[in-house]
Structure formats: C-alpha cells, structure tokens
Amino acid sequence: MSSNHLGISGRIAALFQQAQITPLLALVALLLGLFAVGVTPREEEPQINVTMANVLVPFPGASVRDVEQMVAIPAEQVLSKIAGIEHVYSVSRPGLAIMTVQFKVGVPRIDALVRLHDTIRENTDWLPAGLGTLEPLIKPKGIDDVPILALTLHSKGADHTAYDLERVAVSMESDLKRVNGTRDVVTLGGPRRSVRVELDPARMNANGVTVADLRRALQSANMGMPVGEAISANRAVWVEAGPFLESAQDVADLVVQVSNGKPVFMRDVARVQLGPLPATRYVWHGTAHSEGGQEHDAVTISVTKKAGENAIDVARSVLQRVDELKGSVIPDDVEVVVTRNYGETANDKAKKLIQKLLFATASVVALVFFTLGRREAAIVGSAVILTLTVTLFASWAWGFTLNRVSLFALIFSIGILVDDAIVVVENIHRHQQLHPGLPLFQIIPGAVDEVGGPTILATLTVIAALLPMAFVSGLMGPYMSPIPINASMGMVLSLAIAFVVTPWLSRLWMKPHDATHAEPSNAPAASTGLSDRLRPWFEKVFAPLLSERDGPRNRRYMGLGIAGLIGLSVLLPATGLVLLKMLPFDNKSEFQVVVDMPVGTPLEETAATLHDLGAYLATVPEVSHYQAYAGTAAPINFNGLVRQYYLRSASEMGDIQVNLQDKAHRKAQSHAIATRLRPALQEIGQRHNANVKVVEVPPGPPVMAPIVAEIYGPDVETRNQITQAVREVFERTPGVVDIDDTRIASAPRKVYRVDRHKASLLGVSQADIVATLHAALSGESASFLHDASKYPTPTQLQLPAALHGNEDALLQLSARSTTGKLVPIREVVQVQNVLREQPVFRKDLLPMDMVMADMAGAIDSPLYGMFSMRAEIQKIRTPDGLPVQEYFIRPPGDAWKQVALKWDGEWQITYETFRDMGAAYAVGLVLIYLLVVAQFGSYVTPLIIMAPIPLTLIGVMPGHALLSAPFTATSMIGMIALAGIICLLYTSDAADDTPCVDL
C-alpha cells in the first residue's frame, strides 16, 4: 500500500519500523520504568490529602453550658466560614472546648492550616480578654501523622521500670531523628521525670507556709539573665546574674519563709526528690504463651515520615540505626521489639502485587504463544513490559506512590493494555498468510493501518469509561484515583508502543513467508477446527431466532428472558445473596481492642481490665504479642486518625494493640480472627463493667464507626431519651456489635464552693484558694530545672499520692490573708457532692448525640445492619408523641423543631462513592456512544453495539453470589471497565468491507 493512502497509524508504523531511533525509544522507556521502580515511594496505602485540626480552648472552672455557649458556638461560627471546610465538630466538657475542623479531601495542607490560623487570629474578639479562657491551641493532623514504625522497649528481666525505659527511649529520640525522611519521633508511656515537691500540710501550717509561698520561692529563685557589661582593666567583661536551679538539692535548699528568725527550707515543709511523676498512664508488652506468655513494663517509640518519602527506606534506616545504638545507648538487658513496620508491610504488599502483575503478563504471553506462535508471543511480551515500565514512570511523574491501589490498577488493566499489541501483531501475522511473497517491511504499514482506526477508537472508549471515575468525590476519590488515571495513561502509552515499537519488533523477529516455502501456521487451522466444531451449536441456538415464521416470537421471548435475568440479578443484593459493602476485608497483621471503663474509673482498675484481656489474648494461637496502653493511646493508624484516638488520655480509657503472626504462618484471615475473639473479649469486659470494642484496620477510607446514628433534637433531655431508645434498638438487633454512644455514665463530682463573703472578711482571695487546691490535687509545675535535659524537668508541687483521697489533708492547707495570717481552706469552702456533667457534642452548628456500632457475623456489611433497624427505629416516639424523622444524605434543616436521626458512617461514604461512580458510569456510556457515532456515522448502530452492556449484570451478580463475594467499589470499577471494552476490528475482505464488532 502506498504511504499516500495510509492513515495516521500506518504512517507511524512505516516511519518507525526501520528507524534507528526506535530501539533507542524502547530502551528509554525501559530505563524510565526501572528508574520509577527505584525512586517511587512505596507505601501500603495511597497518599490522601485530608487535613484536620483540633482547636483546644481551655476555660478553667467553667461548666459545660458555659463552655458550649461562650466558647464552642462562637468558635464554630468563626471556623465554619473558612473556605474548603467539610465539617466542624465540637465537644464541650467542663473547662475545655475542643473544636475539630475537617477540610475537604484534596485541599492542600499548608493552605488549609494558613487559612485556619489566619481566621483564628483575625477573630480573637470571640474570646474577649478577662473571660477566663486560655490561648487557643491548634493541633493539626494529617495522614503524615500516622506512624510508620513503632518500637517497644521492655526489660528482658524485671530490672528496669517504665521510668528507666523512658530515659533510654528519650536518649534514642535524637539519634533516630537524624535518619533522613523521619518527621516525628515520640515516646509513648513512661511517667516523665520531675522534681516532686510533696506537700506536708501539717508541717506547712506549723511553719506558716502556704502553697503560694512555695510557688513564689521557686519562681523567684529560678531567675537568671545577662545584666550588661562592665569595664575592668581596659576590657569589657560580660556580666550575668543568677544562677538557675539545676538539681533537686537546689530545690530542697531553698529558703521559703523565715519563722521566728529562723529560715524555713523547702525540705522542712515538703519532701523533695528527683524521680517519676505519679502514674497517669501505664504501658506494657505481653507475649503469647507460645513465646513465654510474660508481661513487662514498656514504652513505645513511634516514628512518622515526611510526605513523599519512601516508607520502606525510612523504616529500614531507622532499624539500622537502632541496631547501631544497641550496647551503647540501649542497655544489653533492654529488648527492642518492632511492633509496627508499615515499611515492611508496604514492601510485602508491593512484592505480592508485582508477582501477580508478572503472572498476569505471563498468562497473556502464554495465550499468544499457543494461538499465534513463539515469535509473536515474544513481541507481545516485550510490548507489555515496555508499556508497564513506562506507565510506572508516568504514575511517578503524576505524583502517585507505589501502593496496593496503584499496583491494582496495573493488574486490573493488564488485559486491556495488551489488546493493542495483540491486535497489531495478529493482523501482521494474518497479512503474512494473505501475502506470503511480500517482505515484512511492505506488509507491516498496511496491516497496522488496517486496524489502526478501530484500535484508536477502542483505546478511547476504554478511557472514556474509566477516566470519569477520577472525579469521584470524598475520601474514596483520591483513594481510588490511581485506578482510572493509571489505566488511562497505560492505554495511551500502550497504543503508542503498539504503533511505534511493535512494528519494529515484528520486522526483526517475525519469520518472513515466501510463496513457495511458506510455513503453515497452526493458528488458522486451530481456528478453523474450532469454528467447525462450534458452528452446529451456534446454528442450533440462533436458527430459531432468525426463522421467518417463529423468529419474531422467539426473539420476544428471549428479550423477556434477558429482562427477567437482569431483574433477578439486580434483586440479588436486596435478598442478601450478594452483599453490598464498601470494600472487602484485607488480611492485616494487627487489630486493636479499645476499652472504655465508666467515667471516673481509677487508672489501676483500667489496667487490671487490660491485664485480664491480655491474659486471654496470650492464649490465642495466632497472636504473636500485644502492647497494652492504660490512660494513653497506642500509636494511631489511619483509622485512629479519623476517630481521634490520639485524644484518648483519661484514666478510664485504654486499648491493646494486638499483633498477629505473619500471614504465611496462620491459616485464618485477620477479620475471621477478630470476629472469633470478640465474644470472649467482651465477656471479660462485662465482668469489669467495661465497654470492649474490637477495631480492625479498614480496607478503605476510615469512618467514625461503620454504623453511626446522629441524633438531633431541640434540647438535651429529648436527645438523651432518643439516644437511649436508639441504643436499645442497636442492642436488640442481631449482628450489631461494639455498641457505644457519646454519653458518659453517671460519675460523682465534688465541688468546693468558696464562701466569697466569708473569704473577703478574712482577707483571702478566691483565686488563691482555687490555685492551692489545684496544685494539691492535680499538681503544679511551678518552675523547671536547668539541667540540659531534652524535656525540661518540672518542679511539681503536689500532695503525696497517698493523700489524694484524704479530704482532711486537702482542706488542712491554708491560704495567706491580706494581714499575713494563715486561713485554713476548710473555713471558707463548702463541700457539695453532685454528678459529673454530660459533654455536649455538636456538628456543623447543630447539637447532636451519636450512637455507634459495627456489624459482625454472617452478614458483616454495615448497610444491612442499618436497614434492618429501621423498622424498630420508626416505632420510637418523642416526648410529644411524634415519630423520629430519618435522614440518609443530609442533616435535618431545622433540628430545633423536630427530633431527627441522620445515618452516617460507612453508609455515607458508600452512598457518595456509588453515587459518583454511577454518574461516572453514565458519563462513560455517553462518551462511548459519541465516539462510536463519530466512527460509524450512525446514531442507531452504536446503540446496537452497546446493547450487551446491561448483560454484564447477568454475569457479575450471580458470579459474586456463587463465590460468596460482596459487591464492592472495586466490583463497580470492573463493571465500568466492561462497558469500555469494545474492540472494533476492521477485517478487509475482497467481497465484504463491513466492520466486525467484537464485544
């Protein structure tokens, strides 16, 4: 064929089939791919730019109502005007307001935080001076705050306490921070080092000393600064005054008062010692019975990485540095256990997916080998390898990391990527059969041109089907965006390689045929034999449909039958034979046991509950080891980031990080293990009056809880009543587990009410009384040692731990009057015993409560649990006798006039994802239709070509049912891709020039 009659594809093939630059381009593509594999950061999860921040406003002494009305509500109104805000949450507790600002997915972190800081600084008048609030504290959080590595230090014997281990961990922090790519290195656990000044009320009164005197002595004595220069002997001498307090002995030797002409030292009225603070948290490491079954005091070092860094490299470098520190910074009898290594799990996941990618490629090459021959298979295999490598480079250039989603995109599209090369090679092979006497360089341009137009159209149709998915909103959007983007880029690059490199390889590797010694090809014979065997079956099936007499009736019956099958397929999810859920569970190596004791539970009782839970976990064969955290939170994962587990620091809170054996050493999946252990763990929790929840790492974007019911109402009493009724429905519903709500259990509260009139008559200020009581019970860091510690060592004024429950000792403390006399606090306060106030939760400027739960059992999709409760919830009546209004998509417009329930959790993200993917599906179908119309010049023919698309339901839904697989977002992606796999092949024939459409 003359080059003047060739289309764009034929001309490209003619240009590059003998060009010397073609092998260079192929080599560059290969090297770019190898470069991308080496430099692309490897992570287990894709990077999601989701920014949230906590704004904490302390309001000491304020009631919940004051905190809500005077701080939280004005703050919400200020924060909600920031551009890019998704939600504003707040919780008002006694003395503290916590506002959580959640930005929309995709808003750049720096931009979001700059807007937040600017807005707060520009609106400081919402916290007027003198109100009593402290400076707002902004704590931003994002995906990079999730530690990739956790190192737990424990003693091999019983020689080291948590205090000793904390000192070792703090010494390690600076060395680990020197590793390139690390972001934060933080020690969790340990009591912290301090100079404890334990007050002795009797000796203080005997010596005429108050807490204010001790505070003043510490602060005034710990003062030093440069005071200037002095000229002496014709030289300038730098002059300083001081010195600072440098040791516990310096503190003990301070003179705090002069009594009867004699100095009163700090050691005379308090016990001064350097050591750990009173325990406010416990951390310990436990091993399974198979590994000894022991528990040891521990601390954990968590390491986060900078954005864009390779998790594998950072984790490997940190562990190498730890090995270097052993024997020097780390004592020989201290063991370091790697309790989290997301670098290793990311590497394992990447290796596994790359193996699957290679297997898929080998399968395609093997298929071509058996149908076309070994030379053709080698050409297709080379084209596929080049396509994959250059696609990896394009993915890196786009900004994607190498994670399970981006690699899944390549595996998912491997069958599509090979189509272009196979079509070109097969048509060149066919033209060799038709023109055995012509040299390959003359055959190739025409053969490529013949299928070039349909191949371009086929590529565009697949891109049209997939690319709209890149615009899915919410958390799932950036989570799944590598799939449509990588697959679309791969399709374009596959087309370029098919037109540029494949003709060049075909000219070199395919054996030329001549007219007299042409080797017969096995493929046509096999194809002909297969056609001969299938022809009677096709005639038997399709003849009744094409019959002139009975054909119309049979076609109507067939249409009704197909419609019925489609209808039955659609009904499968409704009947529960095919479960609908966001994503299938992954086989993880960890899960958490989250424990909530009744509010007011002492730390020691929480620890006792965790010990009992740990003793049971040690007997589980699949458990390798665990770490228990009482009064503090374990290193968070992405799930904990969204659920704000990092704020769990009360004495009644705890959790256990459970680490399972490697997947290769256990048969059960992590989800099955967690489901199996939940009943026993919750039974142990019930014995301790604890709410125990088993929290798994979600396979996709996390939510506050899988099932969330948000309760809106006009007043607190109504919301509490409806919340309790909804919780009871949750508890009665089979399969609904891990039930909790935002209310707290009734707990005692003691109020020391100052008699202002009497205090004024005695010359004592209320501020002195409150400050004295606060220092005695909570402790007060009156000053700090200057001892070159990384973390400043506070001098902590406080009653001894043994006297914390002794009200007489507390009220024995005195305050100094304006006349200098000591006034015992018991003379100016009245003790009231009341209950703790309930916190108030708000979302997007509306007060609300939440009931949260998970779903477990045979039907573990939260959607089915949610819908199964609707009938019972509709029976609930408000105090006015009205039903509770249900909302599924948006919150109620006016929560002050009605009681409403808004379903959230996994339902919300599932709805948004499938809504957007359904819209993407529709847009893809429209684009495919327009492309095919442009190709055929007909508005009817494309409808005939696209008619089989709905038939995919007949295969997809029953297939999921047969395999007991849930229909997930990835299933939806597969359905969308099926709509785009329309390969248009033009086959030139002497008698017929009609296009052949292969669906």
Positions of PLM-derived features:
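Conserved small/polar residues in nucleotide/adenosyl-binding loops
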Residues: 653, 986-993
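Signature of alpha-helical transmembrane segments and their immediate interfacial
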Residues: 3-42, 451, 521-581
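Membrane-proximal extracytoplasmic
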Residues: 2-361, 402, 478, 698, ...
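Hydrophobic transmembrane alpha-helices and their membrane-interface caps
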Residues: 35-39, 362-429, 471, 489, ...
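Helix-loop junctions and hydrophobic alpha-helical segments within the transmembrane domains
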Residues: 339, 346, 350, 425, ...
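Transmembrane alpha-helices and their membrane-interface boundaries in multi-pass membrane transporters
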Residues: 134, 413-428, 452-471, 478-525, ...
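C-terminal transmembrane helical bundles of large multi-pass transporters
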Residues: 342, 378, 680-988
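Solvent-exposed, membrane-proximal periplasmic/extracellular interface segments of envelope transport
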Residues: 5, 14, 68-140, 202-223, ...
